[in-house]
Amino acid sequence: KSHPIATEDEIGWAMVKELSVNAAKLFEPEFEKQNGRNGRLSIQTDPRNFRNAKALTDQAVEFSQLAKNMIVKIPVTSEAIAAFEEATYQGVSLNATVSFSVAQTIAVAEAIERGLKRREAEGKDISQMGPVCTIMVGRVDDWVKVGAEKMGAKVDPEILEWAGVAVFRHAHKVYTERGYRTRLLSAAFRNHMHWSEIIGGDSVISPPYAWQVKINELGITPNLNSVNEPIEARILDPLLENFPAFRKLYDVDGLKVEEFTHFGATLRTLRGVLQSVNDLESFVRDVTVPNPDK
């Protein structure tokens, strides 16, 4: 009623913004306690703009102003890398999403570093900025398994469960060595190792609630320095030798920036998040144009 002439799309995004503002308030005490490092609420930019760096930058700036503890998600496509630098320069704390490979995490971190250095050169404050780069570890596993299925590869199934962990540990090693100010974030859990086998670094490990319950019920005692340990050769060698897709994900130069958008794992995930936009519009439509047959 407060938006009588708004489109379904406009109403949907108004809902996203209002819900995000309300949720962000819950995290404000932790945000203040951690001086911006933690206590943030992630809000997603419109994934339909995945090829438009300016649109992503503009929306990231808009969303960052909704609350002081917003962190804004931008997908790691080829076209979006420029947005990571520019939005950072404009003071936005970013969460890089739709990200699966060491190469993507490096491109993000380098772009954010450029943005931070531009701010520093102009005397602009960065003390409360807390950028993160997600690795969708479970979707790494998923994509390697798709490749294994297509190839008819015969390997110990346990090995495939380590693909996301291996990529995360390698990226963490690179981040530590290069001193990036962006932190890694683990997302898209598929097994407890996406928590228990990547602990001990300056990273964000935040299992969804359902996984927190499972982990507690399992009573697992994690290795508190697991992220800094090398992957066993019996696991890593077969992954590198048998699965070209895994090597693209694992190697520092496995993907070129111009390959990010059309990489298989990216396309799979983009299709999912784009469908979510359609689902949001459908949800609004059921309210604004209710089905009279029900």
Regions found by a protein language model. Name each.
Residues 19, 23, 55-59, 83, ...:
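General structural feature for long, well-ordered alpha-helical segments within catalytic domains
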Residues 1-12, 41, 88-92, 113-116, ...:
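Domain-level signal for soluble alpha/beta catalytic cores
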Residues 1-84, 89:
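Active-site beta->alpha loop and helix N-cap motifs at the rims of alpha/beta catalytic domains
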Residues 1, 138, 142, 244-251:
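Short, compositionally biased low-complexity segments
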Residues 24-31, 35, 64-67, 112-120, ...:
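Structural signal for hydrophobic packing residues in well-ordered secondary-structure cores
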Residues 225-294:
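C-terminal extensions of enzymes
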Residues 8-19, 23, 51-55, 100, ...:
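Catalytic cores of large soluble enzymes that bind and process phosphate-bearing ligands
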Residues 93-227:
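Catalytic alpha/beta core domains of metabolic enzymes, predominantly
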